[in-house]
C-alpha cells in the first residue's frame, strides 16, 4: 500500500481496490455461521432444538425499495427501543387487531392469513421451536413475503419477519429484535414454571389483566412477579398469601417492596386526619390528591396541635387512633353519633394558644384501641370516630386523651367509680384542675360540634354531650346535662371550679382544683432525682490500747499521736505528762514500762499490747510544743529531729518489729521537776548520759521542782535502728527547735549510779532483747515501780539520780536503736554531749546497756 502511494496512484484507486460488498458478504457468511452455531449451542444447553437458518433470514434494511416500508420499519425499531406498555395477548391478537382493522390479521385462530403480497424480498421467517407443544408452522412464502402485521411484541405495524406458532396461535414479529425479546421472555417464564412447579398450582388469569406487559398463554400457568411485573428466570418465586389470592414474587426484594407498599397504605389510612391529607377509602392503592402528606419519619414528630390546626380531611379509613383510653371528649352513644355526626363540623382550634400551646408534645404511641371502626351512618366528611370499648370518640379528641394520659400516672387512668351519678361534677382525670364549669357544660361553639378541642389549651372545653346511661362504665361521663351556653364557646380558665375535684376512687385523696396546666402532685417526672447517699469517709481512729493503758491526762488522743496538754497541766499534776507527743508506738514501748507507775505517771505512760507493735514502721507524731522547753529535764525525750520542724518526729526505724516501738514521748511529767538547766547543764547531762552520768550541773533543781513551762515542749524523736554510731549520730543531730530540757537533775547521779543503772539496763535490755516483748519489760517496770524498790534488785531503781535522768531514753528493745533529744536551735551546741558517742555504741552491748538502762530508769522515775 505504501509502495502504491509512493508510486503516485490516485486515492481513488486505493478506495476502488476495497470492494465493500464482497468482503461484507464473506463476513456475513462467517457471522451467520457463528450466530447459528452459538444459538444452537445455547439452545442445546437448555434442551431446545436447533434453529434452522435459511438463506433469506438475514434481512438488510437497505434492500427495501419503498421509502415507506423502510421508514415504517425504522420507526418500529425506534419505538421498540422506547418503553411501551404491553397489552395482554388476547387483546393483541383479537380485539385490538379487530379494532385496528388491519386486513393482515385474522381473528379466528390467530394464524396469519394475510393475502400473498409481493415476493420482492423473499423473506422467510425463522422457525424457532422453543418447546415441543407449540409447533412452528412455516407459512407459505406467498403469505410471508410482504405482509403488514402487528408485531406480537412491540405491537407496531410492520412487515412480518418472523412468526412463532404457539399451539393454537401464531405470533408474528416485525423484527428479529422483537422476536428475540419475546422468545427470551417466554423461555424465562417456562424455565421458572418448570423449576418452581407452579404451573398447575394457581390460576394465572389475573396476570393477563394486571400486568402491563405482554403475558403469554400457552395452556400453562404464567409466573409473572406481582410487584415488578417481570417474567423472571429465577427459582426464587415466593408465594405470599394476600387474602383470597396468592401472590408470587420473583425475589425477596420485590416481596419486601410489596409489603412496604401495603404497610404504607395501611398506615396512611390509619393516620390522624391532620397528619395525612385527603385520602381515599381505606384500600385504595394510593392517594391521588395533591394535598396528600407522605408518611415519612418526620410525620411521627409532627405535633398534634399543628396537625389539628388543619381542618380534618375526610377519612373513611377504619380507626385513626393510636391507642385506647378513657375518652374525656364528646362521648356519644352510637345512636347519637349516627344522627348527629352527619351535621357536626369540626371546630377549628382557637388561634390563640399562648399559655398552654403544646406543639412540643410529640404523638405518644400507645396500645391499639380495643376496636376501631367508623360508626354506622357517619358520612365521609365527618371527623373520624374511634370506636373504643367505651363508645365512639372523635379521633382528634381521642389522640389528645392519649397524650394527656401519658402525662398522668397510669394508676389515675382508671374509670371513675362515681361516673354513675350524672349530676356529680366530674373532673377530667387527665388533668386535675380540668372539670366542668360550675354553671353547667359549656359547648365549644355550635352545640352540634362534637370536636372537643385540645384539653391543653387555656380554654377548657368540657364535653358537650350529656352522659348516656348506656355508656360503658370505663367511659368518662360528660358533665351533667345543662343548658349549653353558646355565648361561652371557650370558657376561660377563671371559670373553672375552685372546690376539690372528685377523682377516681383508686386515688383516696382529694385533689384541689388546680390550674389546667399545673401538674398533678403525683406527676411522674423523667428527671433524675439526686438522693444524698452516705459516703463513708475514712476517719483515723486511735488504736485501742491495753486495758491498763490510759491516755495520759495531759494527752488528747489525736488519731495516731497524742497531743500534749498545756504545760501548766504538766506542772500542776505531777502525774500529768502534758508535753509529750506520744504516738501509739511510744506508748507501746515506753508506757508499757511505766504502766504500773504511780497514778500520776500512769497517765503519761500508755502501755499498748505488744501485739500492737507490729503496725507501720513510720509513726507520725504531731506534737504540740506546749512550752518551748520540754518538761524539765526531758531532753532525753526531746525527739531528735532531722529537720528544724517543731512538730515533726522523724523516725528512721529499721525493719525490725521492735524498732517501731522505739519512739520516745516528750514527757511533760514532772521528772522530779527541775528548772531547765542551761546549756552547760545540758552538756553536763549529756555527759552524764554518755559518760554514764557524770554529775550534772549543780544548779539542777530538785526532782520535786516543777518543770518550767518550757518543760512542756514536746521533742522530736529520731529513731535510728542502726547500731552504727555514725548513723545514730546522724539521727541524733538535733533540730534546733527542741531545747531538750536539761536533764532532770537526776539528783546528780554520781558515777557509781551509772554502774548500777548499767546493771539494771543490762537486766532490762536482756529481758527485752531476749524476750522481744515490751510486755515483759512493762511487767518488769511495773513491778519495779510498784514496789518502788525494784523487784529487779536494782539498788538504784528508786535512786533519785535515776529518776532525775530526763535524758534517759526509754529502753530500746534492741541496743542499736538510740533516740536522742533535739535541742533548741540556740542550744544545739549545748546538746552535743547528749549524743551517744560512737565509742559507747561500738563498745558492745554492755557499754550500750547502761545508758539504755539509765534511760529506762529515768523514764520510770519521771513517771513516778
From Swiss-Prot:
Coiled-coil blocks: none
InterPro entries per UniProt: RAI2/SOBP, Znf_MYM
Keyword Ubl conjugation assigned: yes
Motif placement: SUMO interaction motif 2 (SIM): 648-652
Modified residue annotations for Phosphoserine: 627, 694
Basic and acidic residues composition-biased segments: 1-14
Region called Disordered, residue ranges: 1-25, 304-360, 413-484, 550-616, 725-750
UniProt keyword terms in alphabetical order: Isopeptide bond, Metal-binding, Phosphoprotein, Repeat, Ubl conjugation, Zinc, Zinc-finger
Motif placement: SUMO interaction motif 1 (SIM): 618-622
Quaternary state and interactors: Interacts (via SIM domains) with SUMO1 and SUMO2.
General function of this protein: Implicated in development of the cochlea.
Protein name as catalogued: Sine oculis-binding protein homolog
Organism: Rattus norvegicus (Rat)
Gene: Sobp
Amino acid at each position: 500500500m505504501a509502495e502504491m502511494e509512493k508510486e503516485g496512484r490516485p486515492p481513488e484507486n486505493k478506495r476502488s481496490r476495497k470492494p465493500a460488498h464482497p468482503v461484507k458478504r464473506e463476513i456475513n457468511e462467517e457471522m451467520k455461521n457463528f450466530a447459528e452455531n452459538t444459538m444452537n449451542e445455547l439452545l442445546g444447553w437448555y434442551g431446545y432444538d436447533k434453529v434452522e437458518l435459511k438463506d433469506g433470514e438475514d434481512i438488510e434494511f437497505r434492500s427495501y425499495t419503498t421509502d415507506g416500508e423502510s421508514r415504517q420499519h425504522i420507526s418500529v425499531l425506534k419505538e421498540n427501543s422506547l418503553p411501551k406498555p404491553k397489552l395482554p395477548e388476547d387483546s393483541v391478537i383479537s380485539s385490538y387487531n379487530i379494532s385496528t382493522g388491519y386486513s393482515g390479521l385474522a381473528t379466528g385462530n390467530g394464524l396469519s392469513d394475510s393475502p400473498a403480497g409481493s415476493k420482492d424480498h423473499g423473506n422467510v421467517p425463522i422457525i424457532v421451536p422453543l418447546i415441543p407443544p407449540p409447533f412452528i408452522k412455516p407459512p407459505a412464502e406467498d403469505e410471508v413475503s410482504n405482509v403488514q402485521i402487528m408485531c406480537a411484541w412491540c405491537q407496531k405495524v410492520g412487515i412480518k419477519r418472523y412468526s412463532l406458532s404457539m399451539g393454537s396461535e401464531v405470533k408474528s414479529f416485525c423484527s428479529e429484535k422483537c422476536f428475540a425479546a419475546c422468545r427470551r421472555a417466554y423461555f424465562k417464564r417456562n424455565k421458572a414454571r418448570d423449576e418452581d412447579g407452579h404451573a398447575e398450582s394457581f390460576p394465572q388469569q389475573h396476570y393477563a389483566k394486571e400486568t402491563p406487559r405482554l403475558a403469554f398463554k400457552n395452556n400453562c400457568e404464567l409466573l409473572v412477579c406481582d410487584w415488578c411485573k417481570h417474567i423472571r428466570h429465577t427459582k426464587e418465586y415466593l408465594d405470599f398469601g394476600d387474602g383470597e389470592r396468592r401472590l408470587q414474587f420473583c425475589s425477596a426484594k420485590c416481596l419486601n417492596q410489596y409489603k412496604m407498599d401495603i404497610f404504607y397504605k395501611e398506615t396512611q389510612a390509619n393516620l390522624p386526619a391532620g397528619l395525612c391529607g385527603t385520602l381515599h377509602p381505606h384500600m385504595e392503592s394510593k392517594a391521588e390528591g395533591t394535598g396528600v402528606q407522605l408518611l415519612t419519619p418526620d410525620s411521627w414528630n409532627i405535633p398534634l396541635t399543628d396537625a389539628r390546626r388543619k381542618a380534618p380531611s375526610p377519612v373513611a379509613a377504619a380507626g385513626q387512633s393510636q391507642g385506647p383510653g378513657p375518652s374525656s371528649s364528646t362521648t356519644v352513644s352510637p345512636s347519637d353519633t349516627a344522627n348527629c355526626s352527619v351535621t357536626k363540623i369540626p371546630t377549628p382550634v382557637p388561634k390563640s394558644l399562648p399559655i398552654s400551646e403544646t406543639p412540643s408534645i410529640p404523638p405518644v404511641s400507645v396500645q391499639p384501641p380495643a376496636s376501631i371502626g367508623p360508626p354506622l351512618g357517619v358520612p365521609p366528611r365527618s371527623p373520624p370516630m374511634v370506636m373504643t370499648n367505651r363508645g365512639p370518640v372523635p379521633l382528634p379528641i381521642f389522640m389528645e386523651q392519649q397524650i394527656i394520659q401519658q402525662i398522668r400516672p397510669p394508676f389515675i387512668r382508671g374509670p371513675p367509680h362515681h361516673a354513675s351519678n350524672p349530676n356529680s361534677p366530674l373532673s377530667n382525670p387527665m388533668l386535675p384542675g380540668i372539670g366542668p364549669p360550675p354553671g353547667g357544660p359549656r359547648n365549644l361553639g355550635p352545640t352540634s360540634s362534637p370536636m372537643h378541642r385540645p384539653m391543653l389549651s387555656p380554654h377548657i372545653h368540657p364535653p358537650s354531650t350529656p352522659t348516656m346511661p348506656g355508656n360503658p362504665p370505663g367511659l368518662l361521663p360528660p358533665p351533667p346535662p345543662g343548658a349549653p351556653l353558646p355565648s361561652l364557646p371557650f370558657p376561660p380558665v377563671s371559670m373553672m371550679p375552685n372546690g376539690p375535684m372528685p377523682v377516681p376512687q383508686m386515688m383516696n385523696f382529694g385533689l384541689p382544683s388546680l390550674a389546667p396546666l399545673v401538674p398533678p402532685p403525683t406527676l411522674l417526672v423523667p428527671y433524675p432525682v439526686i438522693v444524698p447517699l452516705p459516703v463513708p469517709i475514712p476517719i483515723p481512729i486511735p488504736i485501742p490500747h491495753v486495758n491498763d493503758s490510759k491516755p495520759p491526762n495531759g494527752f488528747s488522743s489525736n488519731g495516731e499521736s497524742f497531743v500534749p496538754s498545756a504545760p501548766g497541766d504538766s506542772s500542776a499534776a505531777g502525774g500529768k505528762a502534758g508535753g509529750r507527743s506520744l504516738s501509739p508506738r511510744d506508748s507501746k514501748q515506753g508506757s508499757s514500762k511505766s504502766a504500773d507507775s504511780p497514778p500520776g505517771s500512769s497517765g503519761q505512760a500508755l502501755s499498748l499490747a505488744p501485739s500492737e507493735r507490729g503496725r507501720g514502721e513510720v509513726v507520725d507524731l504531731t506534737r504540740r510544743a506546749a512550752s518551748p522547753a520540754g518538761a524539765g529535764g526531758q531532753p532525753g525525750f526531746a525527739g531528735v529531729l532531722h529537720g528544724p520542724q517543731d512538730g515533726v518526729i522523724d523516725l528512721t526505724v529499721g525493719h525490725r518489729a521492735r524498732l517501731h516501738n522505739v519512739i520516745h514521748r516528750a514527757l511533760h511529767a514532772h521528772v522530779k521537776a527541775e528548772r531547765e538547766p542551761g546549756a552547760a547543764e545540758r552538756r553536763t547531762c549529756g555527759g552524764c548520759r554518755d559518760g554514764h552520768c557524770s554529775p550534772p550541773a549543780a544548779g539542777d533543781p530538785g526532782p520535786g521542782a516543777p518543770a518550767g513551762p518550757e518543760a512542756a515542749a514536746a521533742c522530736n524523736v529520731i529513731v535510728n535502728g542502726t547500731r552504727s554510731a555514725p548513723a545514730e549520730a546522724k539521727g541524733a543531730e538535733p533540730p534546733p527547735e527542741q531545747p531538750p530540757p536539761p536533764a532532770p537533775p537526776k539528783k546528780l547521779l554520781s558515777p557509781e549510779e551509772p554502774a548500777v543503772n548499767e546493771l539494771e539496763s543490762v537486766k532490762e535490755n536482756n529481758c527485752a532483747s531476749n524476750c522481744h516483748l515490751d510486755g515483759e519489760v512493762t511487767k518488769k517496770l511495773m513491778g519495779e515501780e510498784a514496789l518502788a524498790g525494784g523487784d529487779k534488785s536494782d539498788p538504784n531503781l528508786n535512786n533519785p539520780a535515776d529518776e532525775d535522768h530526763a535524758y534517759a531514753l526509754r529502753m530500746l528493745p534492741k541496743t542499736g536503736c538510740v533516740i536522742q533529744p533535739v535541742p533548741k536551735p540556740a542550744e544545739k551546741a549545748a546538746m552535743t554531749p547528749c549524743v551517744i558517742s560512737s565509742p559507747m555504741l561500738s563498745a558492745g552491748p554492755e557499754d550500750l546497756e547502761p545508758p539504755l538502762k539509765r534511760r529506762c530508769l529515768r523514764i520510770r522515775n519521771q513517771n513516778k
